[in-house]
Amino acid sequence: PLRFYFHSVARLEADDEIAEEVDAPMFGTILHAAVQKLYARIVGELHPGETLRTMLRTGEVAAAVEAAINENYLRDTAATAEDYTGNLLLVKDIVTRYLRGGVMPYDAAHDAFTVTGLEQEVAYGFDFASAGRPLRMKFAGIADRIDALDDGTLRVVDYKTGAPHLEFAGVESLFRGE
């Protein structure tokens, strides 16, 4: 009741504060924003391996991670890495290494695909029967990335970031849900 009063009657809002530590959801937000900045460039590009390799050779990955941190965590697009605390420098390094050492080299080496969507809402109805009655269940969510493979397969990519430990076990672990 008191929260309702402050929010709806008195129109008071809690100040937006920046937490001292980057929690798992914010880590995921930073990673997803960086991937979106980088991969937006290759949406619709057939066999984007060379473009990805070019991004890896230049400073584009680090710049995308910094932009994602500035927009989503610091909420200051003019900030630079010199403004980062030790914890934020660590997050920047982990996200950059995750992209430069895993996701992007893997995609560059296995580039028989075309990115068709980023952060796209998807929904799928699944029909089944239970106790002789036809039922329908809807699965819905946001796909981090959707690729059309050369063989006609549609691939939905989910960057796993919600685990409490932020370790990268290898590219294959991305596809096992680890």
Where are the language model's segments positioned?
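Active-site-adjacent bridging/hinge elements
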Residues: 2-13, 69-74, 154-170
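Mg2+/Mn2+-dependent nuclease catalytic core
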Residues: 122-178
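Conserved helicase NTPase motor core
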Residues: 31, 111-117, 134, 145, ...
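A non-catalytic, helix-rich entry segment at domain boundaries
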Residues: 34-119, 123-129
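Residue-level signature of transmembrane alpha-helix interfaces in integral membrane proteins
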Residues: 15-16, 48, 174
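Secondary-structure capping and boundary motifs in well-ordered enzyme cores
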Residues: 1-2, 19-30, 57-65, 69, ...
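C-terminal, charged and often intrinsically disordered regions of DNA end-processing helicases
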Residues: 1-41
